[in-house]
């Protein structure tokens, strides 16, 4: 679902892979991608709920230099108009080495809804981080 929405908005997906819910694996991959500047934006999906195995926000916050609290706040606020269970989402967002990292929900419909709502502002943020604006 991420690929479809991102490409429909005119952007390129350079890496997509299902990863295990393992904090060390997730943080290592995100860190390598950001430090290698493989992409301007890293989007994750899933692993931000309340299940014991959910660790994506912790993996993200462990590696970012600066947190961007407004993105997950806006995502939760928007999704609350559709389901109150959105308040249970623990997504995080931040910046590492001029690369933005954003955690998205795990369900395809929620990913689509969030990206369509947030992507213009996320792209603006990426441009600011890159010094393009």
PLM features: residue spans?
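Non-catalytic beta/alpha edge segments that cap or flank active sites
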Residues: 1-133
């Amino acid at each position: 679902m991420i690929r479809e929405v991102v490409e429909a908005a005119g952007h390129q997906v350079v890496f997509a892979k299902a990863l295990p819910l393992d904090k060390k694996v997730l943080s290592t991959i995100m860190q390598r991608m950001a430090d290698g500047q493989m992409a301007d934006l890293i989007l994750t999906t899933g692993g931000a709920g309340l299940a014991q195995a959910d660790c994506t926000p912790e993996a993200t916050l462990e590696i970012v230099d600066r947190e961007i609290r407004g993105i997950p706040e806006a995502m939760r606020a928007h999704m609350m108009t559709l389901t109150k269970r959105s308040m249970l989402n623990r997504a995080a967002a931040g910046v590492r080495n001029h690369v933005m990292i954003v955690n998205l929900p795990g369900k395809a419909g929620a990913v689509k809804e969030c990206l369509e709502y947030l992507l213009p502002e996320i792209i603006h943020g990426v441009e600011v981080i890159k010094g393009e604006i």
